[in-house]
Amino acid sequence: MAGKTTTACTHEQYETIIKTLYEGIGDCIQPNPRIATILVIEANVGLRIGDTLSLRRSSFIKTPSGHAFNIIEHKTGKVRRFKVQEQVYNFLLEYADSEGIEDDNLIFPIGVRAVQKHLKKVCDWLGPGYEDISTHSFRKYFGTEIYYKNGKDIELVRRLYQHSSAAVTAS
């Protein structure tokens, strides 16, 4: 997808895509709860798709204030530990339980290209307004939501993303 402009999902686009992935559309789009769950996690945690797909049950740790993920970012090699909302933790744990996923196993045993391919099929079916949506749009959606809910605080988003500068975050 190099060279292609990716935009953040709007709230409406996010809801429509996730609903379509969970429910499917007749014979055109088969339901795919796994991909829907992957994108929900990306949009609610702000991870890159590769980092989302590398999550294991053992990535979760109990902290005095709740739960956190321990990951090493694929792109940067940076070690990250960050708090996860209880609702997100429970959502992901319920998914892992329903799929019979053990501690050391990947929660989402699927490749990045497979997720991108299925998302593109859904976006192509949804039509105009969805052509610039990719898996990265869900990470951007997370940042956009944080930005507006916190008084347009770009520095907060930069810190959450662990970007080197606000200019990188704003791009």
Residues covered by each model-derived region:
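DNA breakage-rejoining catalytic core of tyrosine-based enzymes
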Residues: 1-19, 77-86
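Basic, Lys/Arg- and aromatic-enriched nucleic-acid-binding interface segment
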Residues: 7, 11-45
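Short, basic (Lys/Arg/His-rich) helix/loop patches that form interaction surfaces
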Residues: 21-30, 103, 117-159
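Short, charged phosphate-coordinating catalytic segments
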Residues: 42-65, 155
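Conserved tyrosine-mediated DNA breakage-rejoining catalytic core shared by Y-recombinases
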Residues: 54-89
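Short, polar N-cap/turn motifs at the start of nucleic acid-interacting alpha helices
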Residues: 59-64, 152-171
